[in-house]
Each structure stands twice: as structure tokens, then as C-alpha cells.
């Protein structure tokens, strides 16, 4: 590496450290122009684009870096850097790109366990269950004492219906002498899931409660601010008035881009199923679990010089500021998705943007909203059964009481803000979609201004083989099933302690 290129790389890294990603892109792009076959430069350029929000461009360079690293690995059989790159592709949601790198890496060095681990994860997230299972078994055969790989293989076995195999494997993992808190937590969670599938309902909550007791010892959980979201919801309930929410309801907005449709709800209410059905319409483009609204809130904070609460900042905003933030949203969307979204109705499905409903309504009063509902008992059961990435929201779903309380906080916010909304919305019950598909979905398409297309009933065919950023990724790659309705009835004794919290919402939405 020449002195000049080395200097460009140092300047690029300094820009990253300062979070000036546009400047970092400029430095790394110049370095790449001078040394186009250097995988490190290509990777740095790709990462910088991704951090800047230009994911489509970033992934292009990350993929190039992966191929250059594989070319080097063929000479020395050292696939570690190539697999680090595959891991980065997974981080940015490019499981197809990661799969390509992993397939080549395990051919170059078939004895390196991490290659098969990442290969299994790539296949799994793309709903390629049999291939994931083969890779998971190979990984564990190379490191038979690994509790982490045993848990991974058990999750793949559960996905493929090998429930008894998974149960035995997980029970064995829990006897492992050197098991870490995170591994123990995961094993209890997965064992609860497989026992549920085996209809051994009496043992399920024993493992869910055990996982909840272990969770605070996991570093990623411990560092989350559990008070953040409840405090935010309390502020929003008090400060988002009907006047504020309707402030720009009669405004005329530029019509270069139709207003988005927002698909929201609580976790595990069927938002992923609904996005796949709506996204099966040829005129709909789905943005799946993005940071678009979160980025707009950050930008609002920045231009408001971080003074006051979000509702107070919106009160101080003039119409030019509203137009700026709308444009900021669309520019970021275009950076993420490029030309793929052109000419199509933009469906923003980021489930917990429910928290930011006030911001959404203020800035996009011309948007449409689909809010998902589901029996609160099935919601809470499904939430506590899932293993989710720790965030200030998901840390509430680690215990039974915490799950019910957080559900109540979010739904109280919805019931408070709903009568004040100026945007058009529809409440959509998951159960209606399961039992009367066409009758349930036709009003949603009507709200979106779209004709009914019978082809949307085959949504699961589109979902198979693609990456879906939700714990439900495997469930929506199959036809609708009714077994997810009324699951709570298997656990009626466990619901006694949280029913006082849930009953008001069951009453409001007429769930018996």
C-alpha cells in the first residue's frame, strides 16, 4: 500500500470515528480508485456507504471485497477474513451475498467450523431449511463440545420439524459444565418452544421463567435502558394533543411521491404476515423493519438543537421544516432501496414505530395507517416465546409480568392517540385474516387505493427463499395456519397472574 493510499485510509478511518460518513466515503472512494483490487479498501468503502444509509451501494462494495478475499484465501486456505466479510453482509441483511461467500469458503477450507456456522445461518434466514440443517450438523461435528453450535442446530431442527431431536439436544446442552449465561438463556428459550410444539405444555413456563431469571446476567441485556420507552410513552400521551396532531392535516404537500402507508402494531400481532400479503400486490413496495422513522426523529432532534421533548419540537417546527423532514425520509428511503421503490406505493412496516405514531401523523397526515390487533393473550405468549435482539423495547419481554405490562403501556398509548389522529387508519384483526382472508384484506387494499388482486393469496410463495427481517420469517413462508389462534388456552393457569393487566384490552376489542 503506497503512502498516499495509506494516508487516505487513515483519513477515512478518522472520518468514521467522527461519524462523518460522507467524508469517509470520499476518502475510501479515492483509495479504491487508486487500488481497486484491495479488499480492505472495498470493505471500508462499503461499510461507510451502509453507515451513511446508502445500503444498496454499500453492499455492492462489500460483495466485491468478499470475492477479493476469497481469491486470496484460495492461495493460503485461510478463510477467516472472507468469513468476517460474510458476517458483515449478514449484519446488513444481505443473506444472499453472505451465502455466496460462505459456500465458497467451506470449499476452500472444509475444516473451519465458522464457515459452516455462517452458512447455516444464511440458509436459515433464506428459509432453506434442509440446507441449513446440513450445514449446522457439519459445524457441530467439527466442534462437538460447543454449546452454542448445539443450540443453533436445535433451532434448525425445530424449523425442520425434528422436535424430539431438538428437545434431547437442548436438555443435554443445559447439563454442559461450562455453559455461559447467554447460552443457558437461549437453551431454555428454545426448549420452551420445542416443548410447546411437542404439546408438553406443563413444562414450557418452567423454562421461560428460568430464561427470564438468567437474562439480567447477559451483558447486552444489562446495558439496555428499560425505563426509556415507558417514559417516552408517558410523555407522548401527555403532550400529543389533537391540535398538534391535526396541525398540518389540511396542508397541501408536493405530490412527486404518494404518501407512505404505515403498518404498525405491537410485536407478534401479525405485521409480518400482513406485509407479505400486501407486498404480494404488484403495485406495493415493502420496507421491512427499517430505521426511516427513527432517523427522522433524530434529525428533528438535531435541527431543534436537542431542546425540549419531541412534541415540543414539533410545535416549534414550521411548514418548511415539515417539508424538509418529509424529504429527509424519502431521500433516506431512496438511499436504502434505490430504483426498486419507484412508481410503487411505499409500505413502511416497522412494527414498533407504533411508539412514534405522533411524529408520523404530524409529518405525514396524508399517509394511511394499518394498525394490527390480535388477542392480547396470544400476543404475550408469542412474545415471551421468542428470542429477540436486546433493545430498550424487547428487554420488557423477558419476563411474564414485564411482557404484559409493556403490552399494556403500548396499547394504552394507541387507545389514547387513536381518537386524535388526523390520518386515515384501519384496525386490522389478525384472527380475521386467518379465518376469512379475502373479506379481511379487501378493506385494507381499499384504504390503500388498490384493487383486490387474487394473487396475493399466494403470498407465501414470494416469502420462501427471501430474507425477512422478523422472527416470523419462517412462518410467513408457508400458507396461513389457524394453530396460532387461541394458543393461550393451553396455558390458562399461567395467565391468571397477568389477566388483570390484559383484561381491559380484551374487553375493548371483544375477545372472549
Model-derived regions: residue spans:
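PAPS-dependent sulfotransferases, especially Golgi type II membrane carbohydrate sulfotransferases
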Residues: 135, 164-178, 187-257, 312-313, ...
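Phosphate-binding active sites in nucleotide-utilizing proteins
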Residues: 254-364, 372
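Conserved phosphate-donor/acceptor-positioning beta-strand/loop module used by diverse small-molecule
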Residues: 360-384
